[in-house]
Amino acid sequence: MSHTETQTQQSHFGVDFLMGGVSAAIAKTGAAPIERVKLLMQNQEEMLKQGSLDTRYKGILDCFKRTATHEGIVSFWRGNTANVLRYFPTQALNFAFKDKIKSLLSYDRERDGYAKWFAGNLFSGGAAGGLSLLFVYSLDYARTRLAADARGSKSTSQRQFNGLLDVYKKTLKTDGLLGLYRGFVPSVLGIIVYRGLYFGLYDSFKPVLLTGALEGSFVASFLLGWVITMGASTASYPLDTVRRRMMMTSGQTIKYDGALDCLRKIVQKEGAYSLFKGCGANIFRGVAAAGVISLYDQLQLIMFGKKFK
């Protein structure tokens, strides 16, 4: 490989990193209220055990109403700073690693066949998600703890954490470094499943479905991204629930003995339905995720003239 080709690849890697991160930061900030409601719904059983929630939420609308009443509108952005700090490098690394891995595989649909090309897209998406998680997991943990740190209806109700740094300080004091990485194994499995489907299906279906008049259409790209996001998030949601429930036990006396123990106890005590609590919010949350992947395409096209290949 020549020096010029190396410089070109490095330049494209930097473009992917920047565009992916900017797109994600904008979309996640706009979807922060939905993100928080989803996490509150998902973790409400652990919150009941810890005393930070008085009674179960009756649904998404009830969660919105009670949160606004007890904590104020601004509270819907609680944990958003950690989410942006986490999501910027996560999405940026996801997109950048994905394109880098795809270029290393160099699968061509015409030359290698659709099946091999499709498998390459799934692998590059999943591997990118797994690699990115290594760098940002503690921020995801902190975001989850802040978002699920609710203030109940009682006037004496107090929050457990006073901010991002306080989450790190208290967790390290009670659980050590391990506390920041509780739930890491199901997180890796979940992110590989989600990212593999998210990127793999999008990259595979986009050149097949978005042709002719639909090629370059932001609306068509957005709708395709939304449908794929819904499928990917639903498929990986039980793993997401397990990892977040494990996160919630850091600093607590009673903990789960691993991901399988957590999964077994949730199903036994609460029913399999509990693995999908908050999943309905993903219908709305998916709008933000779909916006990221379609906005990413548009930003590259507008700013750098880089078209999908």
Swiss-Prot record:
GO annotation terms (biological process): aerobic respiration; heme biosynthetic process; heme transport; mitochondrial ADP transmembrane transport; mitochondrial ATP transmembrane transport; mitochondrial transport
> Which SUPFAM superfamilies does the annotation name?
Mitochondrial carrier (SSF103506)
Which GO molecular function terms does the record list? ATP:ADP antiporter activity
Instruction: Give the location of motif Nucleotide carrier signature motif in residue numbers.
Output: 243-248
Per the record, the major location class is: mitochondrion
Q: Where are the Solcar repeats?
A: 11-104, 116-208, 216-302
Q: Where does ADP bind?
A: R86, K98, R243
Annotated catalysed reactions: ADP(in) + ATP(out) = ADP(out) + ATP(in)
> Which keywords does this Swiss-Prot/TrEMBL entry list?
Antiport, Membrane, Mitochondrion, Mitochondrion inner membrane, Repeat, Transmembrane, Transmembrane helix, Transport
Question: Which Pfam families does this UniProt record tie to the protein?
Answer: Mito_carr (PF00153)
**Places the protein is found:** Mitochondrion inner membrane
One GO CC term on file: mitochondrial intermembrane space
Lineage, top-rank taxon, reads: Eukaryota
Q: Where are the transmembrane segments?
A: 13-40, 81-105, 114-134, 184-205, 219-239, 279-299
| Region of interest: Important for transport activity | 243-248
Q: Does the keyword Repeat apply?
A: yes
Q: How is its activity regulated?
A: The matrix-open state (m-state) is inhibited by the membrane-permeable bongkrekic acid (BKA). The cytoplasmic-open state (c-state) is inhibited by the membrane-impermeable toxic inhibitor carboxyatractyloside (CATR).
State the annotated membrane topology for this chain.
Multi-pass membrane protein
Keyword ATP-binding applies: no
Please give the record's comment on domains.
The transmembrane helices are not perpendicular to the plane of the membrane, but cross the membrane at an angle. Odd-numbered transmembrane helices exhibit a sharp kink, due to the presence of a conserved proline residue.
Q: Which PANTHER family match?
A: ADP,ATP CARRIER PROTEIN 1-RELATED-RELATED, ADP_ATP TRANSLOCASE
Cited function: ADP:ATP antiporter that mediates import of ADP into the mitochondrial matrix for ATP synthesis, and export of ATP out to fuel the cell. Cycles between the cytoplasmic-open state (c-state) and the matrix-open state (m-state): operates by the alternating access mechanism with a single substrate-binding site intermittently exposed to either the cytosolic (c-state) or matrix (m-state) side of the inner mitochondrial membrane.
Report the family membership. Answer: Belongs to the mitochondrial carrier (TC 2.A.29) family.
Subunit comment for this entry?
Monomer.
Q: What is this protein called?
A: ADP,ATP carrier protein 1
Organism of origin is Saccharomyces cerevisiae (strain ATCC 204508 / S288c)
Point out the gene that encodes the protein.
AAC1
